[in-house]
């Protein structure tokens, strides 16, 4: 429920990617694959990978956040809340506070939100609700992941998919509410389809006390199940969001989907009867950057002049959990 006179507007976007590119041809030196095989099945041509001692999750997130603040014409000290959507923090206790310090956002509360590839969309909705409640007026929402840390580079089923990056948007209180609707869902019964699971070794602490210590396994995925899930659930939730907002799908200017696989993007557009040329995609350059995909492709489209003030955008994130969601918003603001 929106309080009278307190709506939400997206006033700026930003992004950051590592400087190092890993091409499909380079991947063919690691696993049995080829540029043609990867492109034809995923739409991916290359991806970025963070280099140790040069880039970190926190540094990429902070750079994207700073870019978004500059686009919104704001100083970091004006931010009330920082939400960092990530599954690959530099510190398991969370990296949002590191980002807060790097930005100099001394007045902001900061915390991580973990929902894998749905994370940015879930964080966007969470930030909007803080504004609508009247608790905060300016929220910085960042989606960032460094999945190269948790990729099995000997598994061609997964290593061809993932890349590193960060994207961000600024949410501000607005008399005109630009977030027109949202829906979020989770189905834990499908959790095993996409995991980055903790693997423990049992150790005896005392004669009658045993503990488990270990680390995380690389990303594991049942690609066929995830594809079937995405092409069914994503169109459904987008249609529900549009219906509740009273908006026809043909009024949508841009379809902004989690960049998982070009086949999924095309299938969702076809099922919604939305022209593929209205689907934003940068998979060819970055691959699947998890929680960063939506804000990264959004920011590139804004900077390229594709997205104009007043454009209606239907967004959907989906992934591990399994979780999925949709949000409908207009770009450009009156604050």
Swiss-Prot record:
Q: Which residues form the active site?
A: 117, 258, 288
Question: What InterPro entries does UniProt report for this protein, alphabetically?
Answer: ACP_syn_III_C, ACP_syn_III_N, FabH, Thiolase-like
Q: What is its EC number?
A: 2.3.1.180
Pfam families in alphabetical order: ACP_syn_III (PF08545), ACP_syn_III_C (PF08541)
Q: Which reaction does it catalyse?
A: malonyl-[ACP] + acetyl-CoA + H(+) = 3-oxobutanoyl-[ACP] + CO2 + CoA
Family the UniProt entry places it in = Belongs to the thiolase-like superfamily. FabH family.
The name this protein goes by in its record: Beta-ketoacyl-[acyl-carrier-protein] synthase III
